[in-house]
Curated annotation (Swiss-Prot):
Disease cited in the entry: Symphalangism, proximal 1A: A disease characterized by the hereditary absence of the proximal interphalangeal joints. Distal interphalangeal joints are less frequently involved and metacarpophalangeal joints are rarely affected whereas carpal bone malformation and fusion are common. In the lower extremities, tarsal bone coalition is common. Conductive hearing loss is seen and is due to fusion of the stapes to the petrous part of the temporal bone. Multiple synostoses syndrome 1: A bone disease characterized by multiple progressive joint fusions that commonly involve proximal interphalangeal, tarsal-carpal, humeroradial and cervical spine joints. Additional features can include progressive conductive deafness and facial dysmorphism.
Subunit structure: Homodimer. Interacts with GDF5; inhibits chondrocyte differentiation.
Function statement: Inhibitor of bone morphogenetic proteins (BMP) signaling which is required for growth and patterning of the neural tube and somite. Essential for cartilage morphogenesis and joint formation. Inhibits chondrocyte differentiation through its interaction with GDF5 and, probably, GDF6.
Impact reported for P35R: In SYM1A and TCC
Pfam families linked: Noggin (PF05806)
Protein name (database record): Noggin
Keyword hit for Glycoprotein: yes
GO BP annotations, alphabetical order: atrial cardiac muscle tissue morphogenesis; axial mesoderm development; BMP signaling pathway; cartilage development; cell differentiation in hindbrain; cranial skeletal system development; dorsal/ventral pattern formation; embryonic digit morphogenesis
InterPro entries assigned: Cystine-knot_cytokine, Noggin
Length: 232
């Protein structure tokens, strides 16, 4: 099994690349720049019977009634009853390339926000001088280096609309994913992976054949990725 690069290797690489020396504040002996590995959260696709006989009819899609059934679980920020304008097209070829560009554009638009991780904020950079003396960098340069490290390990959740099909209401749900097409560590070797998920309550059309076919809407929990972390 391939092991993750050690923290010592990470620090050595920073020294080589930046020509600087980094030491954690408070006399700590180890610098945890990277988050610990997390679960992959395998959110499997739902498998539906292809026979259209199990699809809801037009009379079963009364939006007023369905909104009443869903109640306060309806979240307009993550649910839609009609195709959202920014929903990426499926399929390969040009559509797939356009979707990749849209994903990259969304990634570039996001920047680290909130509180800077303590592991990065606590870094103290010093520049080696003659006779082994050290000199601390200016606050401005130190801040730039910290922001660079933060941006390299930043793992935002990328959201896109997903069509669940006619057997779910609302039919369109905004799902999350982690951008894993580039490494999120220095040196390279780790990628952004799902670390947390939340559940949306949606309605699912279910048919039972016992005593004749009977169908109806039932509430189900639909998981979506809510957090990504830099992991092995």
């Amino acid at each position: 099994m391939e092991r993750c690069p050690s923290l010592g290797v990470t620090l050595y690489a920073l020294v080589v690349v930046l020509g600087l020396r980094a030491t954690p504040a408070g006399g700590q002996h180890y610098l945890h720049i990277r988050p610990a590995p997390s679960d992959n959260l395998p959110l499997v696709d739902l498998i539906e019977h292809p026979d259209p006989i199990f699809d809801p009819k037009e009379k079963d899609l009364n939006e007023t009634l369905l909104r009443s059934l869903l109640g306060g679980h309806y979240d307009p920020g993550f649910m839609a009853t009609s195709p959202p304008e920014d929903r990426p097209g499926g399929g390969g070829g040009a559509a797939g390339g356009a979707e990749d560009l849209a994903e990259l554009d969304q990634l570039l638009r996001q920047r680290p926000s909130g509180a800077m991780p303590s592991e990065i904020k606590g870094l103290e950079f010093s520049e080696g001088l003659a006779q082994g003396k050290k000199q601390r960098l200016s606050k401005k340069l130190r801040r730039k280096l910290q922001m660079w490290l933060w941006s390299q390990t930043f793992c935002p959740v990328l959201y896109a609309w997903n069509d669940l099909g006619s057997r779910f209401w609302p039919r369109y749900v905004k799902v999350g994913s982690c951008f894993s097409k580039r490494s999120c560590s220095v040196p390279e070797g780790m990628v952004c992976k799902p670390s947390k998920s939340v559940h949306l309550t949606v309605l699912r059309w279910r048919c039972q054949r016992r005593g004749g076919q009977r169908c109806g809407w039932i509430p189900i929990q639909y998981p979506i990725i809510s957090e990504c972390k830099c992991s092995c």
